[in-house]
Structures are given as structure tokens and as C-alpha cells.
Amino acid sequence: MENLTYITGNYGKYVSVKEKFENAGITIDYFKCDLDEPDVNDIEFISKEKARQAYEKLGSPVFVADSGFYIEHYPDNPGYPGAFVKRSGVSSNVSKLLETMKDVTDRSCYFLDCLTFFDGNEYYQFFGISRGSLSNELRGHENKRAKSNLWYVFVPDNCIKTLAEMTDEERNNRPDNR
């Protein structure tokens, strides 16, 4: 099988995807590229549009991944920031997020991931969800594999550690990551 090309501007995302595919015997090439993101709160649409752009740049089959982060009881805006994680500033200013959420008791949240493969003719999309809650403080150590600063505040369901506190083995073997 020929290699697949993964397009992203986020090296942490690449490392995570590469490991998952290696376990299935598939080699993933990395192509660093920032793609235009449509201004819509729809992960499925955004991922498909990025795959189209990536295919136009490379001229060969590609896949991209996009994620949303949804805080179910964000004050006055349930589901925030959704697909707008980067643009909202939530992932770059996690301390501000914690301050905003300080009086919220139900801290349920989740990541929604969409992986899109485009061969120039057909789109194939795959989805994953990781449910959990926000911690009350930043926790964990710096990790080059971190896809987002939200790793320091996201505690997956049935876990007591944030993603940033977990070892690679703990993160890969948690109940919601199968």
C-alpha cells in the first residue's frame, strides 16, 4: 500500500494520527500546511472543505482531521466554543476559560473529531467523540504530543487525570480511546 498524506499545521495532531495508523500497518506522511477554515460551526463541513483544499495543493489523495470542543454548560452559550476552538482563543487562554467556568458545577464537555479522506472523487468521513469534564485548574506537564492546551484541563470520563497528566500508554489505553 502506498503511503497516505496527512495535512495539518499541528504536529501534535500528526503524531497522534501516525501512531494510530502505524498500529494498523499504514505509513503516514506529514505535510505541514495551514488551510483556510470556513466560518461555520460544523466540524463535518470544515473537515471536508479542508480536504478539498489539501487535495488541490498536493494533487493526490489526502486526509485531514478537525476537532471541536464543546462545553455543555458554558455560561450563556451552551456548546461553546464548538468548531471555533482556535478562533475563540479558548485553547490559547485556558486560564481565562477556567475563570469563566469557576462557578459552573456541571463541567461536562467533549471533543468531537472528524477525519476526512479525499481521493479527488469521493469523501470518506469518520467521527470520534471523547467525553469528559473540565478540571478546576491547569494540570499536567508540557507534552509535544499535545494537540491543544485543552489537554491541561480535560479529564476524560472514567479517568482522574487530565490528558496532560497521563503517560502515552495511559492516554492510548483509556476506555474512550478504543
What is the role of each PLM region?
Residues 2-5, 12-178:
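Anionic-ligand binding patches
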